[in-house]
Design a protein with these regions (language model features):
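A hydrophobic, multi-pass inner-membrane permease signature
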Residues: 1-240
Length: 240
């Protein structure tokens, strides 16, 4: 919100007299920034959707089968640094000719989002009551029907938490984008980084771009917080 001259003033100016809206206009009027914004939407949305489709049933199956060894595998996948498998996947994507598209980023984001979703859903399904599922089985429901009509509705608060965390981890990911993305498939964190140059650094547009990148996830968390807390509270009361 500061003019460029205010950023270097001494003593520092915390709140300027006039807000520099031109910083935001300069960022939003950039065609490349709009492209990067839609790239982030596609990558984050696809990675989150696929992670939920895989992670929720997987978490339910592991929790109900009490497959503790599988839980250890999920934990190892969760704590493994992304750089350890970035170079092998880069060579694989280069070999199959996928570089220059959004698919490499979507696939490698799944390596991050799927373990998060599975880990959260395992913990949530382990705390949900079994009585309703047992009653459905006695009534003749199949395992899939029990999951779809009984376990899934109860687990909606946990799914909401997994959904938000998957979005946050995918949206803010920087390393995968800067390595796998081409000029036309970069995401917003990479776009903000590319605004830093050796000869000149405009703090106003850079800060405006950083705020625009952070704002969607921040708003999503704020608006969904009440529903998540209310759902978790209801689930705890029913489970007790």
């Amino acid at each position: 919100i500061k003019q460029e001259i205010d950023n270097a003033s001494f003593p520092p100016i915390l709140i300027p007299d006039t807000i520099a809206w031109e910083n935001y206009k300069a960022v939003l009027n950039s065609n490349r920034f709009t492209t990067y914004f839609f790239n982030s939407l596609i990558v984050t949305g696809s990675a989150t959707l696929f992670a939920l489709l895989v992670g929720v049933p997987a978490g339910y199956g592991i929790a109900r089968m009490q497959a503790h060894k599988s839980t250890i595998v999920i934990l190892i996948a969760r704590i493994t640094p992304g750089l350890s498998y970035l170079i092998p996947l880069f060579l694989l994507f280069q070999w199959v000719g996928m570089l220059g598209t959004l698919w490499p980023q979507i696939i490698i984001h799944l390596v991050v989002t799927v373990p998060i979703v599975i880990w959260i859903m395992i913990g949530y399904f382990e705390t949900t009551p079994m009585e309703l599922e047992e009653a459905a089985v006695i009534d003749g429901a199949t395992r899939w029907q029990v999951f779809r009509h009984v376990a899934f509705p109860i687990a909606k608060p946990g799914i909401a938490v997994a959904f938000i965390l998957a979005i946050i981890f995918s949206w803010n990911n920087f390393v995968f984008g800067i390595v796998l993305a081409s000029r036309g498939t970069r995401t917003l964190p990479v776009a903000v980084y590319n605004m830093i140059s050796f000869d000149q650094l405009s703090w106003g547009p850079l800060a405006a771009a950083a705020l625009i990148v952070t704002l969607p996830v921040l708003l999503l968390t704020v608006f969904a917080q009440r529903q998540i807390v209310a759902g978790l509270t209801d689930g705890a009361v029913k489970g007790g």
